[in-house]
From Swiss-Prot:
It holds the Pfam family Toxin_34. Residues 95-114 are annotated as: Disordered. Residues 16-32 form a propeptide. Belongs to the neurotoxin 04 (omega-agtx) family. 03 (type II/III omega-agtx) subfamily. Inhibits voltage-gated calcium channels (Cav). The keyword Transport does not apply. GO terms for cellular component: extracellular region; host cell presynaptic membrane. This is U10-agatoxin-Ao1a. Disulfide bonds join C34-C53, C41-C59, C50-C86, C52-C76, C61-C74. Keywords: Calcium channel impairing toxin, Disulfide bond, Ion channel impairing toxin, Knottin, Neurotoxin, Presynaptic neurotoxin, Secreted, Signal, Toxin, Voltage-gated calcium channel impairing toxin. Expressed by the venom gland. Residues 1-15 form the signal peptide. It is found in: Secreted.
Amino acid sequence: MCVATCLCTFAYVLAKSDEGENLISKVEETQRGCIEIGGDCDGYLDKSYCQCCRNNGFCSCYKVPEWFGYKVGCKCSVDWNFVGWCRLKQFCPGGSQNPSLCKDPNPRRRRHGK
């Protein structure tokens, strides 16, 4: 009786761990993909790859005075009043999950002479 119960429990635990690994890979994909507005993004740690934000938001960095110094961080935002942005400001058109679709919202425009 115990052998059958133990085997069932062991199989259940294995099934759960497989599902857990899938969840971890999905979380990693989400972190490397587009981030919801209001979510934390990486603007200071890796300026060469500013993470993409959904709905044409930008990874905006802020610096807020506190009692003992400043609170700094970066969040996906649509507001322009944050202090500075990532060097490579990027957004994902249409809320895409694919970071390769992210592009600079301020491309250099050619000036046409008259």
